[in-house]
Amino acid sequence: MKAGANIRKICLIGDEDQLPSVGPGCVLRDLIASERFPLVRLNHIYRQKDGSEVISLAHDIRRGMVDPSFYHQDVHFVSCADTAIRDTILHIVKQSLQMGYSMDEVQVLSPMYRGNAGIDVLNNALQASFNPPDTEKREVQSGYRIFREHDKILQLKNQPDDDVYNGDIGILEEVTLPEETEDKRHALFVNYQDNIVCYRPENFDKITHAYCISVHKSQGGEYPIIIMPFIRSHSIMLYRKLIYTACSRARKAVWLIGDMSAFEAGIQVEERHVRRTTLQQRLIYGTTEVVDTDENDFPF
């Protein structure tokens, strides 16, 4: 806003029930709560078809209660032990591909990187199953990751000069070997919807595999099929907004895998870490100074 000296009007569009920003603050929530600005709520949903059980599930999660009768055609819950989650997810992905979906249309989400149902384990398993080593496909190792041609790739940082941004997903189309380049170093070429971006070794840390990504990285995206594991060891990250964000990424079907009690407990938690800000008070009282408030509201 400081950079736009000639701004006459601002229109903010967002969903206060989804995850807040990674950085400090909770701007959209505070702007709405201040009741100082015109507010329009868009209630017609275009992502899913009318009557979709995905819509019903999302509404129920927002209310903190889910009707088990919704687990039918569009919404599925597969109860299984933590040790069986990986193989169950692999089976569902394989089944989806056999039904005609592409790997781009099937997205596995997980709230954490570690554990049996974590992003790292699931990425390795999905790559091994659906893009295994092949003499026809080149690959390069970077740390503990192996980047292989045809891999599903996630951009981790904004690169505006290349028109690729944090959370974008593409396909690794080509690995160039050192002997094929002038500087004798590897090069990776990733296709982001016809935008080809080249990565050299010093930039390999800006990408990772995208077979399984975090819910935070998925925000703003949409996929025909969403698959998400639920285990007790992820409880610290399972709360209503995260689960709502994950499930509402789906256009056609949601698969919830694992421990039903972890899912049910998660949707009961409104916030894991309440963000205490003063933006709402400043807007209401019309001052840039922190307004004295009840001690219980701001116990710091």
Report each predicted region and the residues it spans.
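Conserved helicase motor core of P-loop NTPases
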Residues: K2-R8, I13-L154, Q159-D162
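Short amphipathic alpha-helical segments and helix-helix/interface helices
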Residues: M1, L28, I243-C247
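C-terminal accessory regions
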Residues: R63, Q155, D168-F300
